[in-house]
Design a protein with these regions (language model features):
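Gly/Ser-rich catalytic/binding loops embedded in alpha/beta enzyme cores
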Residues: 1-106
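Short beta-strand-to-turn element immediately C-terminal to the catalytic PLP-Schiff-base lysine
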Residues: 2, 92-93, 111, 120-122, ...
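Flexible loop/turn segments at secondary-structure boundaries
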Residues: 20, 62-64, 107-110, 142, ...
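Short acidic, glycine/serine/threonine-rich loops at helix termini
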Residues: 23-25, 65-68, 110-115, 132-133, ...
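Short Gly/Pro-enriched turn/cap motifs at secondary-structure boundaries
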Residues: 35-36, 78-82, 110, 134-136, ...
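Predominant activation on well-ordered alpha-helical scaffold segments within soluble catalytic domains
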Residues: 48, 89-93, 116, 122, ...
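Glycine/threonine-rich beta-strand-loop-alpha-helix active-site module
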Residues: 105-131
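A short helix-breaking turn/cap at a secondary-structure junction
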Residues: 122-206
Length: 207
């Protein structure tokens, strides 16, 4: 991936979130079948301006919530890719695209990234515009992204992190050095925590 632009890079974005003029935005539900927008979401325009090619929409959980999407895990078709940005993570894991867009209110970027074995990045609140994006929670919704490497993801973040007057939650932040920041290592010593949820007693041994 070139350092200064996204020229001719293929991208996918999840059907649930990103409004587009040239493709339907159905939010993973039949009640919005064929629904299209009169203008692109802000992040789509930023991608186009950077030279990216948006290849298509990926499957998502219905209304970006709990129901499973049509997508399966590319490493094991019998398993889930995680949600709600399931298709976005799976498309990167299956080499359909080098980078992909996702959204997160709870764990909808970091979960499918973990399940599919790709890099998931959920920037801090207010760094990326949600203008033209399906809202689940105004105070919790984030735009995130998926990539194959830690080095690739900041190149996309650098393009999308912009102040947008149509999303009052966004703030000005210079992302010029974001790639260098990823090379510095963690600010604190990482800790690994293993937590048994209430579902632990019913999970199968293979899982």
């Amino acid at each position: 991936v070139e350092k200064n632009n996204l020229s001719k890079l293929n991208f996918n974005n999840p059907d649930n979130i990103v409004g587009t003029v040239d493709m339907p935005t159905e939010c993973g539900t039949v009640i919005r079948k064929g629904k299209s927008y009169s203008q692109n979401a802000e992040i789509i325009d930023l991608l186009h301006a950077a030279g990216a090619i948006v290849m298509g929409k990926t499957a998502t959980s219905e209304l970006a919530y709990l129901g499973p999407s049509k997508t399966t895990n590319p490493h094991d078709y019998s398993r889930t890719p995680g949600g709600s940005s399931s298709g976005s993570a799976a498309s990167v894991a299956s080499l359909m695209a080098p980078l992909s867009i996702g959204s997160q209110t709870g764990g909808s970027v970091i979960r499918p990234a973990s399940y599919c074995g790709v890099v998931g990045y959920k920037p801090s609140y207010g760094l990326i515009s949600r203008n033209g994006v399906l809202r689940t929670s105004n105070t919790l919704d984030h735009i995130g992204m998926f990539g194959r490497t830690v080095e690739d993801v900041p190149l996309l973040a650098k393009v999308l992190i912009k102040k947008d007057n149509y999303d009052p939650a966004t703030v000005y932040y210079s992302a010029e050095n974001i790639l260098n920041e990823t090379k510095k290592g963690p600010l604190f010593e990482p800790k690994f925590i293993f937590y048994k949820t209430d579902h632990w007693k019913i999970i199968d041994k293979k899982s």
